[in-house]
Amino acid sequence: MSEKPVIFFDSGIGGLTVLKEARILIPELQFVYVADDAGFPYGAWEEDVLKGRILKVFTNLLKLYTPALCVIACNTASTLMISDLRQEFPHIPFVGTVPAIKSAAAQTKSGLISVLATPGTVKRAYTHELISSFANQCHVELVGSKKLATFAENYLRGYPIDYEELRHEILPCFVEKNGKYTDVIVLACTHYPFLISLFHKQALWSVNWIDPAKAIARHTRSLLLETMKNKSSKKNIKNYALFTSQNIDFVTERLLQRFNLNIMKGVDFGV
């Protein structure tokens, strides 16, 4: 591949929320979307085992591609090992996806913030450091869901989901404290924005849901300005999607077509 693509990585299809925004801002670049669906969901993995897995995926991936930049479009992976990836592959810029706690603290009026994430992101030291640095004057409720990422995968593919279960998963985000109510909820998993219309319907009261996808896309673009200087707008750029399981059903294939992604099979990720 002659192009230096921008690689987007996630455990599943959640990172498509970020890819979609990036392609709006930088359509002239080539994108490769990599989903470690064989390891999905990441939220319940033991940290050391998951670290080893992600490192192995990238070691094999970067034998195939020399990317202009890699976006870790996964909060669980980013909070776990964005520093490790930067250290292991110092010649490649990495952009992480971390809970938008700083933005939430700036927006809240009640001082009550909730972070809706996976169990892995909730327990991560990185997440707690963000709270200490940017929201130490707020009450921050950390809510780790084991089910929502899977709900999002199913919903996006057109499969039915249990709305009562979904409601049960988000209820802990709605906190009343001393007559004040949660007014900002951070979507700290890239899968969750796919469920935003359902969240609105199941919410106990109106809140501001923060989806960081646009901010990540803007940051990605800012780092690629030099790369884009010599690029002309091409109409026939081919963007690709790779899945570690190699098992892509018809529904997933049709979904990827909506995102203008061509499926590439036969890549050995070593996992």
Curated annotation (Swiss-Prot):
Keyword presence, Cell wall biogenesis/degradation: yes
Pfam families from the UniProt entry: Asp_Glu_race
Similarity annotation: Belongs to the aspartate/glutamate racemases family.
Catalytic reaction list: L-glutamate = D-glutamate
Function: Provides the (R)-glutamate required for cell wall biosynthesis.
EC number: 5.1.1.3
Gene Ontology biological process terms in this record: cell wall organization; peptidoglycan biosynthetic process; regulation of cell shape
InterPro entries: Asp/Glu/hydantoin_racemase (IPR015942), Asp/Glu_race (IPR001920), Asp/Glu_racemase_AS_1 (IPR018187), Asp/Glu_racemase_AS_2 (IPR033134), Glu_race (IPR004391)
Record lineage: Bacteria, Pseudomonadati, Pseudomonadota, Alphaproteobacteria, Hyphomicrobiales
Protein name, UniProt field: Glutamate racemase
GO molecular function: glutamate racemase activity
Source taxon at top rank: Bacteria
UniProt pathway annotation: Cell wall biogenesis; peptidoglycan biosynthesis
Coiled-coil residue windows: none
Binding site for substrate: D10, S11, Y42, G43, N75, T76, T190, H191
